[in-house]
């Protein structure tokens, strides 16, 4: 179907609708997902992405809702790193640390965009100049979203640079599979990972990988998110896996997130105005990876561009 494009003071909104009537809405401000409307087990279509009903509020958003994060998703400890023997200092926007790319990351930028010939996808493009938020190199990032007839949203991320740099983008959508009816504490979650990254009280990795065995972090088998959830802020933890599954018994909706990236961060919105109203599953390179030689490094250069995918598969099943 032909994408529907509406223009607002805040940005351009692109709706991709499939043959069943399910649809996603994307916006060029932050290349973000602002709505994803899919059926429940009874066939009722509802929005499962938690955002703002007034799109103008995204301009004031402090929680990265639905946006592409960059240049570096998650935290860089001390807002500094060494790359190829040179030390770089990036913007510290969370105490002494850099979080989600600094004060004016990709989430706060208007991206150019074009729709594909099939009518089921949109490509967003942004260019980040050398020195942006302290990061080296000029980077051009393209985010390709495609919405399928079987309710799969695929995101391909492609990044190029003119000199060695770091690039670690992700999408920061907040999901509530019940359509916003209640919290996500009764959602069931399964994460295919044996380990998670141990962090300090600023969520900076210590360098140690911890086993999930006999901990609140263990989601290798289906478990309700609220069953062992740490209080008061819930989960904000990166797993060493690339697949997660969510099931909402109330609606029967399911979500499967798969990526080509080495980690996936579980965040239960504990620092949002309404804690635990939603959850984020953010595929990414591990936080603070340039400061830990044993971690996979998100280094790119002119001969080695960035190329990764994330898929969000929505479905239904009976409890």
Please place each PLM-identified region on the residue numbering.
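An exposed, glycine/acidic-rich loop-and-rim segment of catalytic or binding clefts
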Residues: 1-319
């Amino acid at each position: 179907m032909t994408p529907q494009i509406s223009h607002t003071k805040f940005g351009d909104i692109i709706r991709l609708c499939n043959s069943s009537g399910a649809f996603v809405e994307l916006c060029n401000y932050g290349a973000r997902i602002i709505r994803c409307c899919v059926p429940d087990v009874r066939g009722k279509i509802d929005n499962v992405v938690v955002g703002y009903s007034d799109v103008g509020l995204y301009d004031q958003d402090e929680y990265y809702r639905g946006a592409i994060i960059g240049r570096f998703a998650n935290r860089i400890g001390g807002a500094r790193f060494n790359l190829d023997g040179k030390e770089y200092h990036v913007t510290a926007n969370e105490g002494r640390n850099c979080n989600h790319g600094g004060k004016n990351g990709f989430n706060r930028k208007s991206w150019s965009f074009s729709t594909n010939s099939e009518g089921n996808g949109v490509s967003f493009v942004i260019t980040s100049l050398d020195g942006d938020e302290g990061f080296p190199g000029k980077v051009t990032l393209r985010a390709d979203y495609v919405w399928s007839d079987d309710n799969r949203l695929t995101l391909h991320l492609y990044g190029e640079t003119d000199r060695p740099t770091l690039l670690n983008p992700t999408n920061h959508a907040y999901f509530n599979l019940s359509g916003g009816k209640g919290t996500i504490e009764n959602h069931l979650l399964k994460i295919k990972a044996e380990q998670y990254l141990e962090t300090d009280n600023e969520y900076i990795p210590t360098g140690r990988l911890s086993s999930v065995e006999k901990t609140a972090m263990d989601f290798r088998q289906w478990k309700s998110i609220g069953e062992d959830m740490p209080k008061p802020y819930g989960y904000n933890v990166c797993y060493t896996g690339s697949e997660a599954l969510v099931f909402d018994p109330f609606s029967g909706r399911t979500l499967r997130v798969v990526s080509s990236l080495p980690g996936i961060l579980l965040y239960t919105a504990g620092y949002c105005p309404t804690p635990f109203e939603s959850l984020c599953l953010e595929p990414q390179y591990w936080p603070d990876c340039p400061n830990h030689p044993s971690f996979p490094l998100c280094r790119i250069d002119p001969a080695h561009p960035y190329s990764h995918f994330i898929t969000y598969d929505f479905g239904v099943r009976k409890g």
